[in-house]
């Protein structure tokens, strides 16, 4: 039996004027090879910090987007910093189990603020969930926000 997986991202709603009925997600029938799919399941992907931190390491399928990437970086002395997401497309970043927030390559922001209190001297963990990227890229920590 064919299987169709669909990931829908909710980017918020317009909550004023005539656009109040601003539907998001799957708003019409779902078809596969011209046939309407029935009896399908919908479930949330809430991404709580503890669940993301506990994800097992594994080799990413480099042909499919929607991937979690995991890495580490060393810090001598924790300080406020910014994680530069240049090269990634759209997703969420966690450092040491803390959700830094969303990024999107359309800008204007390409750097996410990471407070010193979320870093530790020595090795730190970073997890990136990118909706479009299929291959991991290097990240860079910088001392200033976008210019």
Predicted regions and their residues:
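A cross-kingdom feature marking solvent-exposed beta-strand/loop segments within repeated
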Residues: 1, 14, 80, 99-123
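Glycine/proline-rich low-complexity spacer/linker segments in large multi-domain proteins
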Residues: 9-38, 133-147
